[in-house]
Amino acid sequence: MPSQNYSIISEFNLFGFSAFPQHLLPILFLLYLLMFLFTLLGNLLIMATIWIEHRLHTPMYLFLCTLSVSEILFTVAITPRMLADLLSTHHSITFVACANQMFFSFMFGFTHSFLLLVMGYDRYVAICHPLRYNVLMSPRDCAHLVACTWAGGSVMGMMVTTIVFHLTFCGSNVIHHFFCHVLSLLKLACENKTSSVIMGVMLVCVTALIGCLFLIILSYVFIVAAILRIPSAEGRHKTFSTCVSHLTVVVTHYSFASFIYLKPKGLHSMYSDALMATTYTVFTPFLSPIIFSLRNKELKNAINKNFYRKFCPPSS
């Protein structure tokens, strides 16, 4: 093949919100800042409540606490940089910083998905095998499950980041996104095998996510079958209520992800791509603590008992 003169890229420019009207950027900054702070405070409140309330020292709430940690870290990996770019004219990011951001976003994102799977398994064991629950979900087993979710997320993050950053980037250094998004970054690669790399990355990611979703759905098939065998309507309602918050978060998580990554090509613009991406990176983590604190009665009561009534006592 004839040799080509490539200008190797050492840093990237995040174009994300650069095309937006300037008067909208402070509004978006304020909106995303409030959502970011609420995400942090909401998840910290859940973690503090579980730590304080000894009745919540159960496997289900251990997994929920770990989920809150993963959501905080996922949000911190992306949102602060996005907020800074909204008010700045300097949007460059170094090669190493871009690789780090991609690794941590994938690591915490996949850890979140694996934790949702583990929480589904926990509900399956609690409802379908209640007599064996203490054996199957012992503290040691729970610790192993949590460790596996973090290890799995780390492996996925390292795998994708290593594959992508082994490519050579040349020509334009503009990433048409507000963070180092893998598909936007791959468009800047100058090697002939880029298309096969894209297919490989997509296959790895989709297989892992669809695999998690399939196992969650399978667990709920068995859960619903077990609930339908409960004779009283009150018993069925009480049992299913323990699953509602988890199921709602799963539906929200996968719905937004599917809408962003599986949308038909051509039905998007630079504006809509950036805004839709924030639904998954900002809005979904923002919703999660709201869903768990409102839909989980036991957690809601514990928050009221330990925080709301202390700081906002009822007027006499």
From Swiss-Prot:
Residues 48-55, 122-140, 220-239, 295-316 are cytoplasmic. SUPFAM superfamilies: Family A G protein-coupled receptor-like. Signal peptide: none annotated. The keyword Thylakoid does not apply. Belongs to the G-protein coupled receptor 1 family. Odorant receptor. This is Olfactory receptor 10H4.
